[in-house]
Structure formats: structure tokens, C-alpha cells
Amino acid sequence: MCGIWALFGSDDCLSVQCLSAMKIAHRGPDAFRFENVNGYTNCCFGFHRLAVVDPLFGMQPIRVKKYPYLWLCYNGEIYNHKALQQRFEFEYQTNVDGEIILHLYDKGGIEQTICMLDGVFAFILLDTANKKVFLGRDTYGVRPLFKAMTEDGFLAVCSEAKGLVSLKHSTTPFLKVEPFLPGHYEVLDLKPNGKVASVEMVKYHHCRDEPLHALYDSVEKLFQGFELETVKSNLRILFDSAVRKRLMTDRRIGCLLSGGLDSSLVAASLLKQLKEAQVQYPLQTFAIGMEDSPDLLAARKVANYIGSEHHEVLFNSEEGIQALDEVIFSLETYDITTVRASVGMYLISKYIRKNTDSVVIFSGEGSDELTQGYIYFHKAPSPEKAEEESERLLKELYLFDVLRADRTTAAHGLELRVPFLDHRFSSYYLSLPPEMRIPKNGIEKHLLRETFEDSNLLPKEILWRPKEAFSDGITSVKNSWFKILQDYVEHQVDDEMMATAAQKFPFNTPKTKEGYYYRQIFERHYPGRADWLTHYWMPKWINATDPSARTLTHYKSAAKA
């Protein structure tokens, strides 16, 4: 996890502009650097480093003697960099995984380069010989990237929007900042005056397509066909590979563990892989909740079963409420379900940073979208409609769950790794017949649970544990985080304020008091930036005004049972 920042064609004092880059210093607490581009006095790179790989030579922008005209600033992990280096016999100057981007680009251009990368990434690549600038982001947007560009060709790029909002430019008093779309790269011409002109924006990969880099990876050959046992075997192979490749780090690894299916599978597989790799330290797992919450109890059971060094983080309602302002500032969003679910992740990340030496943190993000794990999938009118919804959710991850996972951990200088969003695992899962992936017998993620039933990775009661609403998991059904928040905002937002909400917030007008409260905080930090959120996360196929699973009939029935 690092923070990248760059300016092209700035007409303001660069030393003043560079102060904006300090707003993302939390992403890279180990070192930082600003570097002007030779021959372009108004172009500059900024980098905040979290040293995860190659502590000695990992500073950026990356430049190597063989390509003196290439400048690279990137945030990410390229898991297949060694395989590609050996395959094409590239001569490396460092041990940094990102160096592969320079070699691939020189060999085959930007399209082939980005399609060959197995990992998560956001990058800015400058080619001064050919006068080009390239921006790129991974398929699901696991690593963030924002840009601002004016009509006269001033370009600013940053890992987080907060590093751009205060920049100055002569042609506009208000610089429009927007997220760079996942699964895309952009080509821009670099002009002699340091400004740029966009040439093309290209969507290079669809989540359902097998990635090009699959031709060169070391995953054992998959079995053909869609018979259940064949599919289960292939899923186990790909999931093991997804976890194993993410062990690439020089820092200690930990894992978030809620006791739910997804994080438990990741933790169990991770511990198994660490033992096989003969890693000398015990795996630290981390759970958060209020006292005796279902998540804490389930996570404790998993930790005892797999043998991890387990940490439990307790918080109370006051601490949760007090964290909301910091959380919304970190998230750069006012989406209700994202804010709600981020408080626990923010607080546990804070604990990890202050009390342990774990820096690279695994989690189960992405599984609900990929494997149709949300409770409302029980309402899908057909397997095909469920498939469409799953792909829509994956496409929008960068606005919601992936955003939450990145910002809450990066705020405390941690790096998050998400095996369920592995290219090969996810593309294979999405290639399966729609009817195999839907909930069965009233149980969501049935295929995923069935896949690991005979693996002995987890206790059966965890493997088949019903999905909890997040607010219930970290607290209790009787006094959930959802209810705590509703009671609090009832005293913060009155009916008169709600009656005039459309006048005050004409875009994405909040429909609930909780939504109104979050929007107020957001506007205080980021006035006039409401369009960063195109729409609220909301369950489909039901008439919902609140995203909580507690409002779903199926969940209410299960909770009473």
C-alpha cells in the first residue's frame, strides 16, 4: 500500500502544489519523495512509501538505467513479476515487482503490458522519449486512483481524492476530481509545455474473461467440464493459488477474521500456506465487536480450530459514533452502508497498527459480490438475473466495498490483500453456469460452502454459518449497530431538516436521517464533491430505502428462527 501523486502542466508554484500530496502521507509512512521530471519544470511525481517489497531499492518513481526515458509511479503488487521476468529473460535492476511494468512496456507497449499483470495496481507511466503519459488501474479497482484534468491540459493524479481537491490552476476556481475507472487504461500525449491531451481511454479487461497472464502462470492445469466435483476441484486449486501468490512480502502477514465464511476461508487457507512456506512467525488474526457479539464468538472458534495467534478488539457504541467523522473523511464517501460497515474495519486497523507488527493484512472482501452472498439474492427472479446482478456489483466494487477496505486500512498504514478478487479465481467462478451459483436450500454461497465441505479447513458450523447483517455480527440482534446508529441520528437530524433535504442536497438526496447525517459530515470535509458517489448502494428486487439486511424479509425470518 503506497500513495502516488503526479502533476503535469501545473501553472502554479510546484512547491506549494506539493503540499497537497502530504494529505495522503498515511498511505506510505515509511518514506516519501518528490521528483521533478527532467526537461519539464511544471511536471512532478510524489510518492509515499509503505515498504513491503525490496526495502532498499523500492523508492519511486522507479527509473532504471536501461530505460532512462521511463518514469513509473505505482501502487500495487504484481504477483507474477518473477514468472514474467524468467519467461522473457528481462534483466532486473531491483527486486521491486513494479519494475516489470517498464520491461513489458518496452517490449510490447501499454496494452500488452497491462493485460499481462497479475495483481492489483494503479499506475502513472511517463515515456519522455515518445512524449506519452499512461494511467492504468486493475480490473476491480482494488488499488485506488483519482484524476483531475482541465480543458487546457493540466493533469493531476493521486491515490486519493483528498490529495487533489486543494490544487490550484489558473483556468478554473474548482478543479473537477473523479475516480479513474477500474479495468481501464488511458493514453495521453505529453506536450512540450508539460501539459497533456487525452488520446484514448481503453477498457482492457472484463471480469468474466480469462486474463492473458493465465498463459504464463504456474497454476496446475484445470479439469474440463462443469460437473460438480470437477468445478469444486478447480475452485480449490484456484483459491489456494490466489492465497499463495499473495504471500509476496518482506513484512509480517495478518488476517481479518469475522468468523463468517469468507474471512474464515481466507484465514484457514492462509495459515496452511504459511506453514507450507515455512514462515517462522505465527499468523495473527483480528476480530472486532462489542462484547459477546456473534462475530467475536465465531472468530474465536475459527482461531482455536486453525491455531492462529488471535486478537479480539472490543469497542462500544460511543467509540463507534465518535469514529464516524474520521471514517467519512478517510472514505471520501457518504454512502450509508459503506460508512456503517467501515467503522469496525477502521477501528480494528487502528488497533493493528498500534499494537502489532503485522502490516500486510488479508481479508474476505469481494466474495459477496462474486459468489452471490448478499441475502437479497434469494429474491432473484432467475439465475440469469442473479448473474447480471453479481457482475454489476463487481463492476461497482470500487465505489463501495473495495473503497471501504482500502481506505480504512490505508488510513493506518496497512496493506490489504483480497484473494477472492484474484483474476483467475473470479473469472473462472463467473464462467460457471448461472444455476450453479445461485443460493440453494435457503443458503447463499452454497457452491462455495460445498467446495470446501470435505477439506477440513473449517468447522462445519462455520462453513455453513448463515450470513449475518454486518451490524448484527459485530454487536447483537437485540441491540445492533444499525439500531445504535438510528437512535443516535434521531437526535441529530430533525423532521424539518428532512423536509428540506432535497433543497439542501439536490444530488443524491438522503432519504433517511442516517443518510442526512453522513452527508452533512461529508460536505464539511469535501464541499461540492457529492458526485464522487454516483448512487447509493441498495439491494435489488425489493422496495428498499435502507441498505441494511435487517430490512429484508428473508433475514428477519432467519433472525427469529
Curated annotation (Swiss-Prot):
Q: Which pathway does the protein contribute to?
A: Amino-acid biosynthesis; L-asparagine biosynthesis; L-asparagine from L-aspartate (L-Gln route): step 1/1
Biological process (GO) annotations?
cellular response to glucose starvation; L-asparagine biosynthetic process; negative regulation of apoptotic process; positive regulation of mitotic cell cycle
| Sorted UniProt keywords | Acetylation, Amino-acid biosynthesis, Asparagine biosynthesis, ATP-binding, Glutamine amidotransferase, Ligase, Nucleotide-binding, Phosphoprotein
* Encoding gene, per UniProt annotation: ASNS
* Residues bound to ATP: 256, 288, 363-364
**Positions bearing Phosphoserine:** 557
Q: What is this protein called?
A: Asparagine synthetase [glutamine-hydrolyzing]
**Annotated positions of the Phosphothreonine modification:** 545
| Residue numbers binding L-glutamine | 49-53, 75-77, 97
Record-linked InterPro entries: Asn_synth_AEB, Asn_synthase, Asn_Synthetase, AsnB_N, GATase_2_dom, Ntn_hydrolases_N, Rossmann-like_a/b/a_fold
Q: Which residues form the active site?
A: 2
Glutamine amidotransferase type-2 domain location is 2-191
- What EC number(s) does this enzyme carry? 6.3.5.4
Pfam families for the chain: Asn_synthase, GATase_7
Q: Which GO terms describe its cellular component?
A: cytosol
The uppermost taxa in this organism's lineage are: Eukaryota, Metazoa, Chordata, Craniata, Vertebrata
Instruction: Give all N6-acetyllysine modified positions.
Output: 385
Q: Cross-referenced CDD domains, in alphabetical order?
A: Asn_synthase_B_C, AsnB
